């Protein structure tokens, strides 16, 4: 029995969280998985100018295996105007944390889905107008979308 527990513990220590980023001009929503990568949860929303410091602090405290960033595309599949801000951030992130892979995930409709999730969850109109909450929920949707896409690759 003790061996089984030790093996389970070692297994958990080898896995890291997946961190999702819904990058915005002013605010950035963040979401993260549990260490077993089963559940996507909203983490927080931070001012974008503090994002890199927040991530660096977070990866010191928590094991992060991968980072996924919402890829803003227009309906015609062309990059949106926000891409000019996201690409330099992702390039810097890859340089500062070369041991953690960074991937893009299509983020079309995440804000619409976030608002619908808030309505379905019974949030009052005043709470639904909190942009920070919308950004955090959008990051959670990006993360869940990434996790769902991996299920089909296994």
Regions found by a protein language model. Name each.
Residues 2-21, 25-26, 31-154:
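Phosphate- and other anionic-substrate recognition elements at nucleic-acid/protein interfaces
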């Amino acid at each position: 029995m003790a061996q089984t527990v030790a093996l389970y513990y070692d297994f958990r220590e080898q896995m890291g969280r997946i961190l999702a980023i819904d990058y915005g001009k002013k605010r950035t929503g963040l979401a993260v998985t549990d260490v077993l990568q089963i559940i996507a949860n909203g983490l927080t929303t931070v001012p974008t100018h503090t994002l890199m410091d927040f991530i660096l602090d977070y990866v010191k405290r928590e094991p992060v295996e991968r980072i996924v960033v919402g890829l803003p595309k227009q309906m015609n599949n062309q990059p949106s105007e926000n891409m000019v801000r996201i690409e330099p951030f992702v390039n810097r992130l890859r340089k500062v944390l070369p041991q953690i892979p960074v991937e893009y995930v299509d983020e079309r409709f995440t804000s619409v889905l976030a608002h619908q999730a808030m309505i379905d969850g019974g949030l009052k109109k005043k709470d639904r107008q909190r942009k920070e909450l919308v950004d955090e929920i959008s990051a959670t949707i990006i993360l869940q979308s990434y996790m769902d896409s991996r299920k089909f690759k296994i």
